[in-house]
Design a protein with these regions (language model features):
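Structured, contiguous alpha/beta core segments that scaffold functional sites
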Residues: 2-63, 67, 110-114, 120-274
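Low-complexity, highly charged intrinsically disordered N-terminal segments
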Residues: 70-105, 116
Length: 274
């Protein structure tokens, strides 16, 4: 090794094994954070969710992407099929299933297949969807005494963190035991952003209620070990989609403005050359 190479190494250090680990001109301004899976969502969840929903509302490409994914993932609905060899039993089960499909929605707005599409859409836009299993009384007259209630992720306060006297801990609204297992969800009775407009606002809507984890299906995509909350699926494309939307708008206005200008060539005598 020459004296020049030794001097360079002393001044700037040895070349890194990986280019991205170096401090060259291309990486000098790249100073990423490295929060844990729980801390990352605590810091960014509300912002990402708000921007994701805003973009889906006003951006045709984002909306089309969500609609296409839901159509491909759910279609007309994911349907179970009995594998029983008893044809009579199979027919009875399928008939019972068809009856329950129409009664599955606790809000009474759609059927079970509609709930699948709605849950998938909520997960894509907001990062997660909470599905509460609501047991019903026999006198309610349902074919199966069970209904499903879909809740947006805002019902589960991500900033709710506490250490309980029982030894359990609450992290991002979810209660864990000392083995790290989910034992309960602490949910708002109504959507916190609806205020007095929410149907449950008069029943302590801004207070949380503890729901056993067995009654909750927490639908989200796990991307990291230890992750407890979901992130919107458009998170990595939000900035570019927003910039593309603004560019497209500006280009449209530019062309519209240019089309409004017209020029005329006049001459004294029709026989004169231009």
């Amino acid at each position: 090794m020459t004296w020049f190479s030794q001097t360079i190494r002393r001044l700037f250090g040895a070349s890194p094994v990986h280019e991205a680990a170096g401090r060259g001109r291309r990486s000098l301004a790249w100073m990423p954070g490295n929060p844990g899976a729980v801390a990352a969502m605590l810091a960014t969840s509300a912002e990402l969710r708000g921007k994701s929903r805003d973009l889906v509302r006003r951006n045709a490409w984002a909306q089309a992407g969500i609609e296409a994914f839901v159509a491909n993932a759910v279609g007309t609905g994911i349907k179970p099929q009995s594998l029983s060899g008893d044809e009579r039993f199979k027919a009875e089960v399928q008939a019972l299933w068809r009856d329950w499909v129409e009664e599955a929605d606790a809000a009474g707005q759609t059927d079970f297949y509609g709930l699948q599409s709605l849950a998938c859409r909520a997960m894509l836009e907001g990062g997660e969807c909470l599905i509460r299993l609501r047991s019903r009384r026999l006198e309610d007259g349902l074919s199966v005494p069970l209904q499903l209630q879909l809740l947006e992720p805002e019902h589960l306060p991500i900033s709710l963190n506490a250490d309980l006297p029982s030894g359990n801990v609450v992290r991002s609204g979810i209660e864990f035991d000392n083995m790290g297992r989910r034992v309960a969800y602490h949910l708002y009775r109504s959507h916190p952003e609806d205020g007095r407009l929410a149907p449950m606002s008069g029943q302590g809507g801004i207070d949380t209620v503890r729901i056993d984890a067995k009654e909750i299906i927490h639908l989200f995509r796990v991307l990291r070990p230890g992750q407890v909350r979901g992130e919107p699926w458009l998170s990595r494309a939000l900035v570019k989609l927003n910039e593309l939307d603004q560019y497209d708008d500006a280009e449209l206005v530019r062309k519209k403005t240019a089309a409004m200008f017209a020029g005329f060539v006049t001459r004294q005598n029709p026989e004169d050359n231009l």
